[in-house]
Amino acid sequence: MKHLLSILALFAIIISSGAEAATPARYSTDGDLMLPENWREWVFIGSPTSPDSMNSGEAYQPGFKYVYIDPESFAHWKKTGTFRNGTMIVQERLKVVEAEYMDNHALIPGDYIGLSAMVKDSKRYPDSIWGFFSFGRPPYGEQVPEIGSMDNLGCSGCHYEADQDWVFTRFYPVLLAAKPVF
């Protein structure tokens, strides 16, 4: 009996270790990505900023970029240093406002100006592994089609050159600090 229980316990461990956590990505029946729930409660990984004033008056995608990763994928990242299938990263853009702050010149976040997301799903996006989406300006769309496949480049044109698995990890100290060293 002891031997049987040991085998059953080992079998349960093997099955559970191969199971992936569910993705936070939800899709409509048409395949459009649904607006993620509570993304501002996810793990905040950084805020790259591209002000027009530092880019000859016209930055590519100007603004503060508040970037979040879903908690399950961040936990996976901390264990493996990889982005699991199902990872969702959300970027919310805000205007850059130049202001006086405590006797200093400062750049502070202004109004929300856009929301985008990328989802890692090797079955749904076999060419690029990641799907890219824009929910537009506030109020954000409830569901949106993919905007960046390898066929039309879009977001994937830049992300193809990213540091690791289509993600510009060098811009996110939270990811770099949490990445395990093997």
Predicted regions located by residue number:
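Short, structured beta-strand/loop micro-motifs enriched in basic residues and often containing a Trp
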Residues: 62-74
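Boundary at the C-terminal end of the N-terminal hydrophobic targeting segment
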Residues: 18-21
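Sequence context surrounding c-type heme c attachment/ligation sites in exported
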Residues: 24-43, 47-52, 61, 80-182
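Bacterial N-terminal signal peptides
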Residues: 6-16
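Active-site microenvironments that recognize anionic phosphate/pyrophosphate groups
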Residues: 55
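Positively charged n-region of N-terminal signal peptides that target proteins for export
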Residues: 1-5
